Amino acid sequence: MTIKNSFLEYRMTELTQQIEKSTWHSKFAALGPGILMASAAVGGSHIIASTQSGAIYGWQLAIIIILANLFKYPFFRFGVQYTLDSGETLLQGYLRKGKLYIWIFFLLNVFATVINTAAVGLLCAAILTFVLPVQVPVPTLSFIVIGVSTSILLLGKYRLLDGLSKLIMIALTITTVSAVIIALARNGIQGVAPADYVSASPWNLAALGFIVALMGWMPAPIEISAINSMWVIAKRRVSKVSYQDGIWDFNVGYIGTAILALVFLALGALVQHGSSETVQLVGGKYIAQLINMYASTIGEWARGLIAFIAFMCMFGTTITVIDGYSRTNVESLRLILGKKESRPSYLNVAITFAALAGLAIIFYFNNAVGPMLKFAMIASFVSTPVFAYLNLSLVLKGEHRVKGKLLWLSLIGLMYLTSFTLLFIAQQAGWLN
């Protein structure tokens, strides 16, 4: 009994010390993985999906964005929570549940690596064509963007990635919020829409595909939870991060990106919704349209501001996509092969593969990027409930096991994600027609 009491007293003392060590200095020092997650999210869902939802439906889909971020919060948090608590990557946790899950994740992840690298590289290059004073072919610009991103990762490693992502997110947040404030001051909450304008309704089956695409990558695909887990491990190799500070970093990144999703919705709602111009749905054409709309509504000087916002979105996403997906590919393959550890050079090989494979798609299969990206989005959305459940199952035990309100939120979120997935499958199968 005495030994048991002594152990409990020791654990209480240890926990108290951990809490006391969590200072504002340690919190800011821990920032990194959460910011990287936010940087990966804004290019995938915000600059296109959020802004288009505002342009087409005004403020109506704000509730969907809020709910998607709210109900996905636990499952992204659990990836970080498991790693901080156990010292293992989320993929190691998947392996404990069964090797089949690692295989499924690996196959989906390799496909997503190639397609997402090509897609974000193309979009980033397309944005550059709007601001460069000379005409440069998009594939050439894609080569430059992906080449620069790869060089940063190969030469600077995690430390440079960590620091660069913070600068990108600070610049992106300031400029995006400034653009919305200027648009509000010029046009008011109604934006450019006439007073008697009747918005199209998103609450019908015809709009389900758009809503599913918005939700699927809002704030990011579910595999980002595994990627974020890898970034937590990388951060702990270069800096001491406590459990409390690691969760704080995650909350800053996740809540920040959720707020930015609404800010990007406002970009579309204030200058495009209700205008006479039909909203483009293709990524590159849509960003060109958005830039032109801001220039005509606010002033020609705003063209550079919106182009800068769009470029920072996509450049930050390009870097984090190549790094994050490469890390999870290396870790997945290590676990499949049963190796104890992987060499640092393996990550360099994976990064190079992601870059070259993405460029191959751009140069030789350019027309296939759209359909392949759509398939990647659908696969990500359909697999979300499975990996969300796995993430939850890994934090039901242990020192920081999930309980109370967070457990209830995760259960409601799991039902929410599963229901939408089944609804989407039913629509695609034609059962709702």
Curated annotation (Swiss-Prot):
Any one GO cellular component localisation term in the record: plasma membrane
Keywords: Cell membrane, Membrane, Transmembrane, Transmembrane helix
Domain of life of the source: Bacteria
Main localization (coarse): membrane
Organism placement in taxonomy: Bacteria, Pseudomonadati, Pseudomonadota, Gammaproteobacteria, Pasteurellales
Location of this chain's protein in the cell: Cell membrane
Membrane topology: Multi-pass membrane protein
Transmembrane segments: 28-48, 56-76, 102-122, 126-146, 164-184, 207-227, 250-270, 304-324, 345-365, 375-395, 406-426
Presence of the UniProt keyword Cell membrane in the record: yes
Protein name stated in the entry: Uncharacterized protein PM0681
Keyword match Transmembrane: yes
